[in-house]
């Protein structure tokens, strides 16, 4: 599966949100977290003799994040006419979701965008957290501060 990193309105280079997402995904290795396989680029604008973009030969620079393939997202499955999850399926998906979230939290990552379209499921019933575009890393100091403030 591919996720295109939009470069249309980027005056300052590679988007910081994409850098953050890539850094987070590169440190997470768990069966319930989507695997980032590689990053691929396509050519940008061709250059003229002086190294300037040639307006006649413009090709938009495209950068893609390549992920392992998953067959469905939870929202797509749930929206199918007549689709009803069984109690064992719900328990299985919840266990996988919570296991993946626990792994992220132990590794100091907050996903911050849990929703059905970001929960990917393959045909064998394996669930993976996806789309870490809003995710943030945190430190132990922040967690200790939050715990003290909540007392």
From Swiss-Prot:
Residues 1-151 form the Protein kinase domain. ATP binds at residue 3. It holds the Pfam family Pkinase. InterPro entries: CDK, Kinase-like_dom_sf, Prot_kinase_dom, Ser/Thr_kinase_AS. Its EC number is 2.7.11.22, 2.7.11.23. The active site is at residue 113. The keyword Cell inner membrane does not apply. It is an enzyme of class 2 (transferase). GO terms for biological process: positive regulation of transcription elongation by RNA polymerase II. GO terms for cellular component: cyclin-dependent protein kinase holoenzyme complex; nucleus. It comes from the Eukaryota. The keyword Transferase applies. It catalyses: L-seryl-[protein] + ATP = O-phospho-L-seryl-[protein] + ADP + H(+); L-threonyl-[protein] + ATP = O-phospho-L-threonyl-[protein] + ADP + H(+); [DNA-directed RNA polymerase] + ATP = phospho-[DNA-directed RNA polymerase] + ADP + H(+). SMART domains: S_TKc. Keywords: ATP-binding, Kinase, Nucleotide-binding, Serine/threonine-protein kinase, Transferase. GO terms for molecular function: ATP binding; cyclin-dependent protein serine/threonine kinase activity; protein serine kinase activity; RNA polymerase II CTD heptapeptide repeat kinase activity. Belongs to the protein kinase superfamily. CMGC Ser/Thr protein kinase family. CDC2/CDKX subfamily. This is Cell division control protein 2 homolog 2. It comes from Pisum sativum (Garden pea).
